[in-house]
């Protein structure tokens, strides 16, 4: 029996020739503003976003409210000459106000530039000097802009303005992303595509991520980072109820999944590991989940197998890409069990080539630098303050990741070239050592760095987050099950928590500096 959509239940007729079930128009391509209007027409009083702050105070906004508020704020932007060609810096935490602001920016046809609300003053100054934003949404005051509105002030800006959406505008470029990279200097990356989705893109996203229409979705990453941003706004585009929380401790996330009967979640492997190691966690805790999509780092085979056992292989999705959008692979759990350790095959007409230091393609199973070409429909990006990536013959580019392919073209990730350590003349991938350490039941997180050493060049040093100190010999004995001897750290250091960014990635440079300062 056909299950009626929200629009059909409310008496609105949908065009059945569109995959986009909310598309009430005639064009296959729909902007975020127009899609928000369509969804709000279909289910105006349904909940669009639920937000819980660190004290668990709950705020809710309906689809009708989200559409009206973002339209009113868009009119404020337009009246202040913010539109196509303008850049709006946005520094709110994950919040309803952040969501309203982004839709308003796109409705005005402007470019959205997210940045951490915890950014240092020097970083904000660097961003402004490089990008020259026209306006900002932030709790701090940024001089030299047309305006800088706080979360409270955006509601004041809405007052007295039209509730109707401005004429549909294409935001192109639609977004400027930040990548810290390994250089220590921020890279600003512009997405040069009109903001919106067509049926092919929505269908591809759904197949790659496991996301469906009108699901309950939990966001556990920052909106200023690529993967959580895509998951959040693609989810809203598909009519999902988006649940935001500022309390990202594993126990709270588990409670949120159960309380809100979450159906879709995107996570980084670090969080997957912390959730899996919660005492008493079991299948019943994730009974509502229909899909878990993981990105943003290496998920070790043993950890992935734990989640396959918890959810079932057909509910686990993995995507591999990067802020520069040079290519894309994906794999689902039931395919992964036949190719354990793989991060998938190229999507669509994307291609992968593994090359040596001279740029020559290597044979299957031989480790080299990962070069990729992007699908024709993929995001077109460019560095604003950095030299463009070198383009090899055939359009192949690389961001410095290391890996190999098997004979069937499945890609396997080893590490970032910058994270490869040379110790005693041997190449050691930090990720491989960290993966082995995390198998130990009491270790919650681990980062391996190379301490300068007169004898070895770099001495392997493991920084470990755990609730108790573990004897070094016990750890070395454990690691011998999984690593050849030269890959086992010479020294270990135990800390209460490991420094990671909001995107879940370890700040290796800072961790190494701290270790050296402490005499590691």
From Swiss-Prot:
Temperature remarks: Optimum temperature is 50 degrees Celsius.
Quaternary structure annotation from Swiss-Prot or TrEMBL: Homodimer.
Cofactor(s) the protein requires to work: Mg(2+)
Pfam families linked: AMP-binding, AMP-binding_C
Molecular function, one GO term: cholate-CoA ligase activity
InterPro entries named among the record's database cross-references: AMP-bd_C, AMP-bd_C_sf, AMP-dep_synth/lig_dom, ANL_N_sf, ATP-dep_AMP-bd_enzyme, Bile_CoA_ligase
Listed EC numbers: 6.2.1.7
Gene Ontology process terms (BP): bile acid biosynthetic process; bile acid catabolic process; lipid catabolic process
Activity regulation field: Inhibited by diphosphate.
Cellular component annotations (GO), alphabetically ordered: cytoplasm
Entry keywords, A to Z: ATP-binding, Bile acid catabolism, Ligase, Lipid degradation, Lipid metabolism, Nucleotide-binding, Steroid metabolism
Family as reported in the entry's similarity comment: Belongs to the ATP-dependent AMP-binding enzyme family.
SUPFAM superfamilies noted in UniProt: Acetyl-CoA synthetase-like
Name listed for the protein in its UniProt record: Bile acid--coenzyme A ligase
Name of the gene: baiB
Induction text: Induced by bile acids such as cholate.
